[in-house]
């Protein structure tokens, strides 16, 4: 993929070059997007809309850190959907990792989470945030033990992993495909910013319906699909149950009990 690659600290240029090679990114001055390596982190900027600010992964502080400390623990809807309220600590594969927030919540509650992210820029941002979190004195130990990243197309990855006899099947496959959101729906300023940037960079997951079948084949216990409250069921398949919040819905497709 081509976009602007900018290094703010000349001494870090070789690191940016390594990132570009790893994620198969190349520089062009013509892109509206810039992947910027600052002295602190990797971030994405929309050059033609500087007021949007930068997008980066922060698993230590901010909203994610606040949710880890005060977010309701295993009583959260996502935790219930994944089966944590039944006394289990399932292994999870997040097939649409994005910026890693939901995966981090599940990991903070004890789950081992493997994350799949198919877009190279998003994967690069997530990998950078994950690396910083692993070095944090407060959360670094368990982040290192419980969170890992796979960069691959979700469809291909789920299908290939399901056929891989050496791959330990996760108890839960979690999916949160990007969904085109109506302009009249209220979102937080942060989510609006990220959705605008991501939908122009990545686009909506128009092939998301194709994720459910390989996810069902891969998960040993259940598949959890996060949807906006106004969205249809994924692939028009009725879930076993749904857990609803104010703005979202977790559709749960049960294959086996969590016991």
From Swiss-Prot:
EC number(s) reported in the record: 2.1.1.242
A GO term for molecular function: rRNA (guanine-N2-)-methyltransferase activity
Catalytic activity: guanosine(1516) in 16S rRNA + S-adenosyl-L-methionine = N(2)-methylguanosine(1516) in 16S rRNA + S-adenosyl-L-homocysteine + H(+)
Positions annotated to bind S-adenosyl-L-methionine: 101-102, 117-118, 153-154, 176
Entry keywords, A to Z: Cytoplasm, Methyltransferase, rRNA processing, S-adenosyl-L-methionine, Transferase
EC top class, as a word: transferase
Keyword rRNA processing belongs to the record: yes
Compartment(s) where it occurs, according to its Swiss-Prot or TrEMBL record: Cytoplasm
CDD domains: AdoMet_MTases (cd02440)
Gene3D superfamilies (UniProt xref): Vaccinia Virus protein VP39 (3.40.50.150), YhiQ-like domain (3.40.1630.10)
An annotated GO cellular component: cytoplasm
Top-rank taxon: Bacteria
Recorded family membership: Belongs to the methyltransferase superfamily. RsmJ family.
Role played: Specifically methylates the guanosine in position 1516 of 16S rRNA.
Annotated HAMAP family: 16SrRNA_methyltr_J
UniProt name for this protein: Ribosomal RNA small subunit methyltransferase J
UniProt organism field: Vibrio campbellii (strain ATCC BAA-1116)
Gene: rsmJ
């Amino acid at each position: 993929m081509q976009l602007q690659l900018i290094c703010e600290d000349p001494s870090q240029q070789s690191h940016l070059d390594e990132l570009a090679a790893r994620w198969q990114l190349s520089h062009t001055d013509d892109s509206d997007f810039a992947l910027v390596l600052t002295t602190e982190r990797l971030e994405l900027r929309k050059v033609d809309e500087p007021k949007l600010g930068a997008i980066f992964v922060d698993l230590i502080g901010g909203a994610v850190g606040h949710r880890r400390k005060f977010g309701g623990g295993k009583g959260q809807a996502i935790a219930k959907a994944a089966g944590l309220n039944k006394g289990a600590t399932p292994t999870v594969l997040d097939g649409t990792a994005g910026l890693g927030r939901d995966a981090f919540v599940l990991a903070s509650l004890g789950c081992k989470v493997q994350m799949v992210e198919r877009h190279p820029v998003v994967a690069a941002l997530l990998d950078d945030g994950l690396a910083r979190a692993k070095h944090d004195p407060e959360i670094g130990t368990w982040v290192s033990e419980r969170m890992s990243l796979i960069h691959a197309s979700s469809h291909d990855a789920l299908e290939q992993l399901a056929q891989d006899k050496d791959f330990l099947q996760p108890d839960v496959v979690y999916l949160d495909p990007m969904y085109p959101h109506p302009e009249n729906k209220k979102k937080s300023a942060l989510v609006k910013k990220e959705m605008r940037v991501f939908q122009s960079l990545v686009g909506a997951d128009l092939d998301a319906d194709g994720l459910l079948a390989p996810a069902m084949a891969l998960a040993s216990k259940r598949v959890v699909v996060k949807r906006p409250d106004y969205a249809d069921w994924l692939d028009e398949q009725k879930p076993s149950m749904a857990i609803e919040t104010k703005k979202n819905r977790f559709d749960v497709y049960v294959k086996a009990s969590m016991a």
